[in-house]
Amino acid sequence: MKRMLALVLLASLAAGCSHTRECHCRAYQKKYRRPLTGTAWQLIQLYGQNVPPEKGVFTVTLSPEEGRISGSGACNRLSGDYAADETRALKIGPLRTTRMACPELEQEQKFVEALTTTTHYDMDGPMLMLLCNGELRAVLQAVPEPNEK
């Protein structure tokens, strides 16, 4: 009987430990994860290269009601349509952009290309990863709300 009680207590302890780890992950996701739509996303990595703010601030926001995307590159604004579903499929475009010349125009064109070739997305905490057939194209970070700074 003591042996059975010891096994039950050990099993309960093990279950409690694994549950605790799971809760930490969920707490992280709950605290930092942002919804795909209605969140301002800022580009931090493009085709495997970090994008420092001095290279320009690249942002997008996906509107939940209208299926519209809007944002900006280093010097131009962009807008267009998008479609997303529960399987994390994401199609962006066609996009329209203003046509101002700027020093970071090549980077801006790569940003637009990454957006329009996106087939899927993934999310981890405050990060949004844009993928094209499984290949990572861009990583964006949720722009903090004014009360989060």
Annotate each language-model stretch with its function.
Residues M1-A15:
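Sec-dependent bacterial lipoprotein signal peptides
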Residues C17-K149:
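Lipid interaction determinants
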